[in-house]
Amino acid sequence: PYLVSSTGFGGLIIVVTPLILATYALTIIVMAGRASVDLAIGPLIGFINVVMIQLLGAGLIESPIAIFLYAIGVGIAYQILMALIIVFVRVQPIIVSLSGYLSLVGINIIIMPRPTGLVPDWMLSWGEGITIFSPVLVILIIATISWYLMAQTAFFGNLKMMGSDERATYTSGVNINLVRIGAH
């Protein structure tokens, strides 16, 4: 009975949104083929979080826009680095992913050995889950619309084709290195 209420659905949205967003990110990488998977997505989210907490505590970052830009920028930079290693150094994606996982777990523990930190005042209400309509739902809706728009692009078609048959994709003139980097 509690789940089928405004508060129940509000709490559900808060709990599942990070998982849905991580799934969107992982799906593109898996679609790239060659047994690609990103084992480090959890530690990467943790890394972004622990560094953000340190930056907030030091007063170096406070604006909601700056926080979102920081989180997205660090995520993109990490994924580009991993993609460049996979594409140009030619290390298997699972090895690169596992190395990133282990590195980030260690770095996260060094940065913050135990849970601590502050939540910005503007974000305090986000975790209450007392209503269905929250900023977390807005983020989920924007991400879902972005996913559907991206699925209509030529890049997405090339990504599906590359995941199905990389050699045929290459012979049809698609720059598979660029598509793989874009997938990350």
Task: Report the location of each language-model feature.
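Single transmembrane alpha-helix segments in multi-pass membrane proteins
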Residues: 6-59
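Interfacial loop-to-helix junctions that mark the boundaries of transmembrane helices
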Residues: 3-14, 60-66, 124-136
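Transmembrane helix-bundle core of multi-pass membrane transporters
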Residues: 89, 93-153, 179-182
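Membrane-interface helix caps of multi-pass small-molecule transporters
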Residues: 28, 54, 59, 80, ...
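Helix-loop-helix "hairpin" substructures at the membrane interface of multi-pass membrane proteins
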Residues: 65, 78-81, 131-184
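Small-residue-rich segments of transmembrane alpha-helices in multi-pass membrane proteins
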Residues: 18-19, 47-50, 99-109, 171-173
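Residue-level recognition of pore/gate-forming positions within transmembrane alpha-helices
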Residues: 46-50, 75, 101-102, 143, ...
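Alpha-helical transmembrane segments within multi-pass membrane transporters and channels
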Residues: 60-101, 144
